[in-house]
């Protein structure tokens, strides 16, 4: 019999289960933090990257301005030192009563300037030199910048230069009427004054010209050098080294996504799939000419609408394609930009592909223009093409595309073409006993999302721990939560839906209570549908009365697409109907059941318009054919998402499994044996349906244990279970009228469905195992975050907190606040706390360690002493009277007992509060309902959403010990280790 591992993988959790010979041996949960900023969804590395970029940008600007100051000092015989600032003081050249540089830039066009004023004009323009390359800005910022540049360009038409425009439009008006102050420069998050760099360069050239005419003497070389230095731009790196290798030819690089050949390949794929679907559902056969007609339309215009497609294929306008949405069947926006920029040309396909490759990889405009000059292009074409923004690649190379597309032009599908060419994805032949790191595999270039990478890393950690403990297995079943692979905004939308769903359920619970209905999942769902359907039956249109809701036999929840045919148990596939309507519908879609009755069907169409779009489409679907049923069912049983297939293939290709037996059940509706599949990606819809059918309550997302329940269900979701489940649902749908006539009780119904449980007493066995789980969390040892807060403050701002100047000096000495470049800042994160114990009194003391300490490589040695607001006590030096116990990091596991508790409890360390010398800790599973009497003393302010204890004073703890928890939740006492310093 099979040894099976199962995993429920989320973006911050891993639920797992191990079964052997159908016996549930073990299960558990691993919780970890998402690799992103929880408030914004931005990368954790983004603040460091932005700070580093800002430092580099400022350093380059400083170097550029210093170079200009040297040039100006030499040419104008000025003192270079006068233009340098020391200790953040104003440079000597700028002291005194000076004219505004905006006014000087205007005067420079009309009168001779002094050497000092001309120097100020040059440096002012060079310091704020406008926008040049905004191709790589994010879309939101770029749009705002381009809009402002265009608006200012229109206004500049009335002025000689940018300086004159800014002076007259803003500075002079303010000078004349000081009540209406308007900033000349942009302030934070404002783009109103954005100017193209080319206009500022033209202004400086014009000023040089005018000053020469007015009699200012300077060399031509000086002018050229100033313009060169002032507007110098470092060449941007290309990204060719980051491009992954072809899936078929590993020595070839992947083809750019926005190349003509790639567009043709994508268009062919979509068109062939559409034509094949029409063949399978309508029995219509299309020729190669039809394929080419559609393709030529796409390649000519870059778009193909659904309306055009229907016309070209001879279909009626009201025909609806599978998954038809919006106006366009195919829309290649980048391809349209490409053909527009090219205009008329005589270039061949290879040249066009290479041009697209250059645009994708070369980000520096000057370098790109040089590269484009190699082709038969005029200057206008080069300029237009260099403005395009291309990124991303396919998984295959030009070499592979050139082999595959000719066969696809004959009408062959992508997989058929690959089979005919004997093209096989490069696979790993060296299988291992343990799964290697993701970045050591062929798939390393497939994922760059840090959230997904962390989830994969933790999955590997848990998997390898299980293999080490239990040995090799026959099969691994995986389910990926739907948020895995989604970006932050998409996940926020999912979370919003879940919260709304939770609220709707709670509201329905209250309504059940008011109506005297049993509070169970069935009645809650009935009430939700009752409200959504405006109190009407979805099929008959009859008004549903409160008395109908109170009568268990009057109403039923119907699957719009029959469950046995679709395996769709989602809310969007459910409606509330009178039992009689459900008896008539049986194992059919609404159209199959009621479509022949035109009057009734018209009524159903009207009723459906008041429902959500997804539900409306299901009800009105007239073409739910057998082939679609199989596709729909397969999608609902197996996870076909890209990220799920990636994790599946990563596991399958690199892990060595036990051989599978030949007598295992075959897959439903398939000739291939399921026994030959070592790794399967299960759908969340299947898990949800089995969870409900096997009697597990709805997920409580506030505690972590539901991940393990899902993993157990995934472990037992084998082919025989799925077949038995499908047969049961089919019988339930087909015999609905008969079952109702016999008045089969709810208890009989529950007993009837037990026959396909994995083993007798399955539910209770699982719940018993779940109760044994200790949730695992990785200790977060790595220092991360800013060294200090961004805001620099005056010393006086801290006087109240620390009791005047002396208190501030003491706070600086103790490291509570820091001095950076003469200014005071608040500390960054406290990433570690070192715990000491007094040798005589046995009291505990804590030495906080901040990211700044780590950066300075200075290990603090003073423990926090509690102080009142407005004063600061000396911290306590950890000398020979104290002994080091252990270091705590976020999510360290500790055993603690306060003086009021009867026994110690395991908790996870969350944070240390230095002002109160206390801990913040949390319960491992965050489950409120199972708090013991002893735990309630510790977690006195816990609630359903958060089981956290704050203000746990450390000095008088009866028990305070550190433990280690493995990836599988095994707890062992931490061995004593010497206090760890910082490597220099």
Residue ranges of predicted features:
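Extended, Lys/Arg-rich, non-catalytic nucleic-acid recognition/anchoring regions
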Residues: 1-463, 706-720, 735-984
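Glycine- and acidic
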Residues: 2, 49-54, 436-449, 514-526, ...
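Short metal-coordination and nucleic-acid-contact micro-motifs, chiefly zinc-binding Cys/His arrays
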Residues: 2, 12, 530-534, 553, ...
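Generic, well-ordered alpha-helical scaffold segments in large soluble proteins
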Residues: 71, 358, 407, 455-469, ...
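Long, compositionally biased intrinsically disordered regions
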Residues: 472-517, 638-793
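Short, charged surface segments at domain edges that flank catalytic/cofactor-binding sites
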Residues: 474-544, 567-569, 610-611, 617-619, ...
């Amino acid at each position: 019999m099979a040894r099976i591992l199962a995993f429920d993988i989320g973006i911050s959790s891993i639920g797992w289960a191990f079964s052997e010979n159908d016996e549930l041996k073990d299960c558990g949960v691993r919780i970890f933090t998402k690799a992103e900023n929880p408030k914004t969804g931005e990368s954790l590395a983004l603040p460091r990257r932005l700070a580093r970029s800002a430092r580099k940008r400022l350093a380059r600007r400083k170097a550029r301005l210093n170079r200009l100051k040297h040039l100006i000092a030499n040419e104008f015989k000025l003192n270079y030192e006068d233009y340098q600032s020391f200790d953040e003081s104003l440079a000597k050249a700028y002291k005194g009563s000076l004219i505004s540089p905006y006014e000087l830039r205007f005067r420079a066009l009309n009168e001779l300037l002094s050497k000092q004023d001309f120097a100020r004009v040059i440096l002012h323009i060079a310091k704020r030199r406008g926008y040049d390359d905004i191709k790589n800005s994010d879309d939101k910022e770029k749009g705002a910048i381009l809009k402002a540049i265009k608006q200012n360009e229109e206004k500049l038409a009335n002025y000689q230069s940018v300086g004159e425009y800014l002076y007259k439009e803003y500075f002079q008006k303010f000078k004349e009427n000081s009540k209406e102050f308007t900033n000349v420069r942009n302030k934070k998050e404002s783009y109103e004054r954005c100017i193209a760099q080319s206009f500022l360069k033209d202004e400086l050239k014009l000023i040089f010209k005018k000053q020469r005419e007015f009699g200012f003497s300077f060399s031509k070389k000086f002018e050229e050098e100033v313009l060169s230095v002032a507007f110098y731009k470092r060449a941007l790196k290309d990204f060719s080294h980051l491009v992954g290798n072809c899936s078929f030819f590993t020595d070839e690089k992947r083809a750019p996504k926005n190349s003509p050949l790639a567009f043709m390949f994508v268009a062919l794929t979509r068109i062939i799939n559409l034509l094949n679907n029409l063949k399978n559902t309508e029995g219509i056969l299309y020729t190669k000419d039809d394929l080419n007609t559609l393709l030529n339309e796409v390649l000519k215009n870059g778009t193909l609408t659904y309306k055009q497609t229907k016309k070209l294929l001879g279909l009626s306008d009201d025909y609806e394609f599978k998954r038809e949405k919006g106006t366009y069947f195919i829309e290649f926006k980048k391809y349209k930009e490409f053909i527009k920029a090219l205009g008329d040309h005589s270039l061949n396909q290879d040249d066009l592909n290479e041009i697209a490759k250059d645009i994708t990889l070369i980000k520096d405009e000057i370098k790109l223009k040089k590269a484009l000059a190699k082709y038969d292009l005029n200057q206008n074409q080069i300029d237009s093409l260099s403005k395009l923004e291309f990124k991303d690649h396919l998984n295959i190379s030009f070499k592979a595309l050139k082999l595959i597309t000719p066969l696809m032009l004959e009408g062959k599908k992508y997989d058929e073409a690959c089979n005919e060419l004997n093209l096989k994805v490069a696979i790993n032949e060296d299988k291992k006993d343990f799964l290697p790191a993701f970045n050591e595999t062929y798939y390393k270039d497939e994922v760059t999302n840090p959230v997904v990478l962390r989830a994969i890393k933790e999955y590997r950690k848990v998997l390898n721990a299980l293999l080490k403990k239990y040995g090799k297995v026959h099969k691994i079943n995986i389910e990926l939560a739907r948020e895995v692979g989604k970006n932050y905004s998409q996940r926020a939308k999912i979370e919003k839906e879940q919260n709304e769903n939770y609220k709707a359920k709670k509201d329905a619970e209250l309504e059940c209570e008011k109506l005297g209905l049993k509070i169970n999942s069935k009645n809650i769902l009935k009430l939700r549908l009752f409200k959504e359907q405006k109190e009407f039956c979805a099929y008959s249109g009859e008004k549903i009365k409160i008395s109908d809701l109170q009568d268990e036999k009057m109403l039923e929840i119907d699957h719009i697409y029959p469950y046995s045919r679709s395996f769709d148990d989602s809310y969007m596939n459910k409606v509330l109907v009178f039992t009689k309507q459900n008896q008539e519908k049986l194992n059919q879609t609404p159209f199959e059941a009621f479509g022949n009755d035109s009057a009734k069907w018209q009524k159903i169409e009207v009723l459906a318009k008041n429902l959500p779009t997804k539900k409306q489409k299901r009800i009105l679907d007239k073409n739910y054919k057998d082939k679609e049923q199989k596709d729909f069912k397969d999608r609902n049983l197996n996870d076909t998402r890209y990220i799920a297939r990636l994790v599946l293939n990563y596991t399958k290709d690199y892990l060595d499994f036990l051989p599978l037996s030949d007598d295992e059940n075959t897959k439903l509706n398939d000739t291939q044996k399921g026994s030959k599949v070592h790794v399967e990606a299960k759908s969340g819809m299947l898990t949800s349906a089995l969870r409900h059918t096997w009697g597990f309550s709805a997920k409580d997302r506030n505690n972590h244990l539901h991940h393990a329940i899902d993993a157990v269900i995934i472990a037992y979701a084998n082919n025989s279970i799925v077949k038995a489940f499908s047969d049961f649902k089919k019988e339930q749908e087909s015999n609905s009228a008969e079952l109702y006539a016999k008045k089969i009780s709810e208890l009989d119904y529950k007993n009837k469905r037990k026959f396909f449980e994995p083993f007798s007493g399955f539910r209770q066995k699982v719940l018993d195992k779940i109760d044994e789980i200790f949730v695992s969390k990785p200790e977060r040892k790595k220092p991360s975050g800013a060294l200090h807060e961004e805001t620099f403050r005056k010393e006086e701002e801290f006087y109240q907190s620390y009791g005047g100047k002396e208190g501030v000096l003491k706070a600086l000495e103790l490291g509570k606040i820091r001095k950076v470049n003469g200014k005071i800042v608040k500390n960054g994160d406290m990433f570690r706390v070192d715990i000491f114990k007094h040798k005589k009194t046995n009291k505990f003391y804590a030495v906080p360690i901040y990211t700044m300490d780590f950066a300075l490589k200075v290990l603090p040695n003073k423990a926090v002493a509690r102080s009142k607001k407005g004063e600061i006590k000396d911290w306590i030096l950890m000398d020979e009277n104290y002994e080091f116990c252990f270091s705590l990091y976020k999510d360290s596991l500790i055993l603690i007992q306060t003086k009021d508790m009867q026994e110690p409890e395991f908790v996870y360390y969350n944070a240390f509060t230095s002002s109160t010398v206390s801990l913040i800790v949390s319960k491992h599973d965050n489950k409120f309902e199972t708090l013991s009497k002893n735990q309630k003393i510790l977690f006195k302010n816990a609630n359903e959403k958060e089981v956290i204890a704050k203000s746990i004073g450390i000095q008088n703890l009866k028990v305070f010990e550190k433990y280690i928890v493995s990836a599988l939740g095994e707890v062992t006492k931490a061995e004593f280790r010497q206090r760890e310093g910082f490597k220099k």
